[in-house]
Each structure stands twice: as C-alpha cells, then as structure tokens.
Amino acid sequence: MKKIFSAFLLLSFALFFSQETKPMFWQDIQNFKKLDQEQVPPKDAILLEGSSSFTKWTDVASYFPDKTIINRGFGGSRLTDLNDFANDLLDPYQPKQIIIYCGENDFADNHQLKANEVVKRYKTFYKKIREKFPNIQVDYISMKYSPSRKELWPQMKEANKKIAAFMKKEPNAAFIDITKVMEDANGNVRKDLFVEDMLHMTPEGYKLWTKVMKPYMK
C-alpha cells in the first residue's frame, strides 16, 4: 500500500511540475497548431509575426481584401519569444512574405534593456527566417511610440533606427516606418489613435498603418 501511495505521489509531482514548467506562451502556440490542423494554411500568403498589435488586429484581412494573410501574432510576446518558438512559428507555413511587429515588450519587460540587445534579438530572428526562407520578402514594422510607454521611447527610437539601417542593407527586406503617420501636425504622437490603456490601437490607428503598409505588401 505504501508503495502504491508513493508511486501516486511521484506521479502527482511529475504531472504538477510538467505543467508548471511549460514556457510562457506555450498555449498560444498550441492554439496556432490547432488552427493549422483545422484549416491547412494557404501557400504564398503574407505571414504576420509578432505581439499584440497584430493579435488585436483580428480583422486584418478586411483591411487588405486582395491579400491572403495569416496572422500569428500573440499578445505580450517579445523577440526572445519569437526566437524560442521560431520553428513553430515558421515551419508550418510557405509564405511569400513575412511582416514582423515586435520589440516593444522587450523594453517593457526590462526598462534597463539597451537598444543594441533588442537589435541583436531581431537579427537572430531574421537569421532564423532566412535559414528557412532565403528569398522571400521580409519586412519589419517600426515600434510605435505608445503614450503609456513614453519613458521607453529613447531606447525604442534608437532600436528603430538601427533595425532600419540593418534592413536597408538586406536583399528582399524593408523597414516600414509607421511612426510619422501616427503624429499630429506638431510632431506629437496622437493619443486619439489609442484605446484607454494608451498602448493598443483604435481602428483609426490600424487604418493609418494600412495606408503605410500597402505599398510593401506583395
């Protein structure tokens, strides 16, 4: 009886710790896998990878009705998470273009983080993409300057500048700057483009993004 009880305890602990050690965003990735099982991902689509600015763009297809889009953004993700789950985020798909929006949360997660580290993280993910898709178009959308994260703007601006310089040198790559279109006539970030949390965008914000993104869409 003691042996049975001991075995039960060991099994219980094993199950408990196996659940506890699942990495952050594991469930999001499982949800993507389920979606891909329910419907085979279309080939030659535009694949969106990144954080909540994509996640909350649930009706993105209606903004680009002539494009086939696969949205694999997951809220709260950092570039480190894109790197950790790169195989899951890239292997199931055969896109003609990948567009990335990520980096804000890296700074939000660690306010002392240097811009160079975020640029390094981005280059790592870019390299992972190129290992699988050497010739497709890859674009990076600049980090927006969310009012709720104003103290992080200096690092974000530096990272944007360095990623832009990197992408300019790469073939079949582009840096999509959405920061200017989100400013008013005086160069200030328009708060009316954000919902109450001053982090996520209103439909009007996405309309402005669409205007900037369209020339880059394949």
What would you call each of these model-derived segments?
Residues 44-59, 77:
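Catalytic nucleophile-elbow at a beta strand-turn-alpha helix junction centered on a G-D-S/GDSL motif
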Residues 16-32, 40-43:
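Sec-dependent signal peptide cleavage junction
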Residues 1-20:
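Bacterial Sec-dependent N-terminal signal peptides
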Residues 46-49, 70-73, 97-102, 137-142, ...:
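Structural recognition of the beta-strand scaffold that forms the well-ordered cores
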Residues 144-218:
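Catalytic His-Asp segment of secreted/periplasmic serine-dependent ester chemistry enzymes
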Residues 115-123, 155-160:
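Charged helix-capping and loop-helix junction motifs
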Residues 86, 122-127, 160, 164:
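Generic structural signal for well-ordered alpha-helices
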Residues 54-63, 68-70, 81-119, 139, ...:
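Oxyanion-hole/transition-state-stabilizing segment in secreted/luminal serine hydrolases
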